[in-house]
Amino acid sequence: MAAKDVKFGRDAREGILKGVDTLANAVKVTLGPKGRNVVIEKSFGAPRITKDGVTVAKEIELKDKYENMGAQMLREVASKTNDLAGDGTTTATVLGQAIVREGMKSVAAGMNPMDLKRGIDIAVTKVVENLKSRSKDVAGSEEIAQVGIISANGDREVGEKIAEAMEKVGKEGVITVDESKGLEFELETVEGMQFDRGYLSPYFITNPDKMTVELENPYILIHEKKLSNLQAMLPILEAAVQSGRPLLIIAEDIEGEALATLVVNKLRGGLKVAAVKAPGFGDRRKAMLQDIAILTKGEMISEDLGIKLENVTLGMLGEAKRVTIDKDNTTIVDGAGDEADIKARVNEIRTQIDNTTSDYDREKLQERLAKLAGGVAVIKVGGASEVEVKERKDRVDDALHATRAAVEEGIVPGGGTALLYATKVLEGLKGENDDQTRGIDIVRKAIVAPVRQIATNAGHDGAVISGNLLREDNESQGFNAATDTYEDLVKAGVIDPTKVVRVALQDAASVAGLLITTEAAISEVPEDKSSGGGMPDMGGMGGMGGMGGF
């Protein structure tokens, strides 16, 4: 086991604080509309240029072990905020630094760290309550666009594209961000339910120009197992022919004579039919087939439920307005399912999302939810170079998370003013003792830091700007760093999602509280690798001298 180096008290805290400052100072230059870029060297390829706080934080690794501990703890603040809210990482870092610095000063002055932490927790709870009480619901796509614009550092095109995507697929829909080959932003949307399975045979194609199968007003047979026996299918095929409507078969697989018969019938024109494999695998396949059944008002034909294929009637089949199938995807548009049944299924999936602990399962459940409740939109980000595309993609990701957070918990005035005005609820608030009251004061000072930093990055004196704002009665009034003016920020469209501000403060206070209450730090002593193992260094053997006589 490697030897350890242990530092106590002030020595430990000094190294940690230095690391916190190093990381925070690199991240906070990106805050606000006039924040600067950070250039990150890559081990191969061009350097990366970004204005995304969490990207900067993740790249920082310090040489000194104790400084690195502080930097990594503060990096955790940025990462956690990014995971929970998707934005606000720079704000969280600025808040974390402010709380740690003030807290360390108080500990150095002889105050009890545990009471300081209790005071910090009391203050954070009060501020969060205040933020929630002042939060406003997002009304319309204009406000959604504004949230996106602010989060994308003033890029109007990004905000508008996200608002357009949300309008098309709904608030529950899936919106993904991809890189585009061209220079432009593009938005692609898929209406209805789409799953990644194409036609089983090209002979099913009805539109040779597009190489797609297009079925208008079809019946949909949803079968859980493989279909290879033709006899069992005959009754339902005959019923479909008599109805004169197309038939889509979704099953685990269709093979042998069953597939051959379907193809022959299609080519002869007796039956408009197409077949696709069921999406997903294992239990997830069952769940997705059930989703399709509910969406199309059909029944999933399963031996487990005691339903045999030969006994299936037209009334047990699903229906939809249109189905389009290409070689990779199947899209069901406007299924005949009952609104109430779909809603119940959506709520069931939501409960599963809340209860699952696996990120992978959560992602798959969210995809299912979107397919049932909304749709899927893809925002394709373009640019003149690979570096530019990556930088813009970072901003679009941030903006997308921010708009989702705004829809979830509402909005507050932006530019750090929501936290600035929350200082008023902490005035006169006392803890059980002086040290707890000092903890409350630490938070009161810290939550002014984001406004100051935004003003500083815009070339103004942060202390003067925050002082001017605290004299205001209108809590929507703030400093718009983009235009260098004092104005009503809600009317000007400078708004932040409440969830982002709340999560940033809670995460910053949580990690800062741990650092303030740290009394010892342990790091590994690097092994001395100057000389290898085995024989000791012989320092050279010298010359052998003349041998003479020969």
From Swiss-Prot:
Signal peptide span: none
Residues that hold ATP according to the record: 30-33, 51, 87-91, 415, 480-482, 496
Localization in the cell: Cytoplasm
GO cellular component terms listed in the entry, alphabetical order: cytoplasm
A single BP term in Gene Ontology: protein refolding
Highest taxon of the lineage: Bacteria
Reaction catalyzed: ATP + H2O + a folded polypeptide = ADP + phosphate + an unfolded polypeptide
Single GO MF annotation: ATP binding
EC number: 5.6.1.7
InterPro entries xref list: Chaperonin_Cpn60_CS (IPR018370), Cpn60/GroEL (IPR001844), Cpn60/GroEL/TCP-1 (IPR002423), GroEL-like_apical_dom_sf (IPR027409), GROEL-like_equatorial_sf (IPR027413), TCP-1-like_intermed_sf (IPR027410)
Broadest EC class assigned to this enzyme: isomerase
Stored Pfam families: Cpn60_TCP1
Keyword Hydrolase: no
Keyword line: ATP-binding, Chaperone, Cytoplasm, Isomerase, Nucleotide-binding
Subunit structure, interactors included: Forms a cylinder of 14 subunits composed of two heptameric rings stacked back-to-back. Interacts with the co-chaperonin GroES.
Database matches in HAMAP family: CH60 (MF_00600)
PANTHER family xref list: 60 KDA HEAT SHOCK PROTEIN, MITOCHONDRIAL (PTHR45633)
Family: Belongs to the chaperonin (HSP60) family.
NCBIfam families named in the record: GroEL, PRK00013.1, PRK12849.1, PRK12850.1, PRK12851.1
Function: Together with its co-chaperonin GroES, plays an essential role in assisting protein folding. The GroEL-GroES system forms a nano-cage that allows encapsulation of the non-native substrate proteins and provides a physical environment optimized to promote and accelerate protein folding.
Full protein name: Chaperonin GroEL 2
Organism: Erythrobacter litoralis (strain HTCC2594)
Gene name tied to this protein: groEL2
